[in-house]
Design a protein with these regions (language model features):
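N-terminal beta-strand motif that seeds the catalytic metal site of vicinal oxygen chelate
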Residues: 1-15, 70-77, 132-140
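Amphipathic alpha-helical segments
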Residues: 13-28
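Exposed loop/turn and edge beta-strand positions of beta-sandwich/beta-sheet ligand-binding modules
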Residues: 3, 34, 69, 112-115
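Short secondary-structure junctions
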Residues: 26-32, 93-98
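Short, conserved charged micro-motifs
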Residues: 16, 80-84
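Vicinal oxygen chelate
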Residues: 75, 85-140
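Conserved short beta-strand elements that form part of the metal-binding/catalytic scaffold
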Residues: 28-64, 121-122, 128-133
Length: 140
């Protein structure tokens, strides 16, 4: 079975986006190209942060620099509150609470079942980030 190991985002400021993911998720920078592209890794999964200025650069057909291709990124985390604090410090935009105001239960801890056990943040360039301690129905 094929396994996901790489994701590529486009950004108007790849360096700033890379700094966000390094601070918020302790990702390591493995390469920075002269054109500004930055490549990160958590030791298992790789992330390329690209900046396409022309149709030829983008390599995605006719959409070029306006290409939209990623809706959100999901991170499995060990401690949701600690990780949420790191995203707050890195400048993330908290889109959902860590505590369910209706039940007082914690989101992302599996108390709602794996299909909804996540907390969402906004990251650089509008990228949506999911975080969960219990994972998702589709993750092993």
């Amino acid at each position: 079975m094929a396994k996901l190991r790489h994701i590529a985002l486009t950004s108007s400021d790849p360096g700033k986006a890379a700094d966000f993911f390094k601070q918020a998720f302790d990702m390591e920078e493995v390469r920075r190209d002269p054109n500004g592209q930055v490549f990160l890794s958590d030791g298992y999964f790789n992330m390329a942060i690209l900046n396409h200025k022309t149709n030829e650069d983008a390599d995605v057909g006719t959409h070029g620099p306006n290409f939209n291709g990623i809706h959100h990124i999901g991170f499995f985390v060990e401690d949701l509150e600690e990780q949420a604090g790191k995203l707050d410090e890195a400048g993330g935009d908290r889109l959902t609470p860590t505590v369910d105001p209706g039940t007082g239960g914690l989101f992302g801890h599996g108390d709602m079942g794996p299909s909804n056990a996540e907390v969402k943040f906004g990251g650089p360039d509008g990228v949506i980030i999911d975080m969960s301690e219990s994972g998702w129905l589709t993750s092993a």
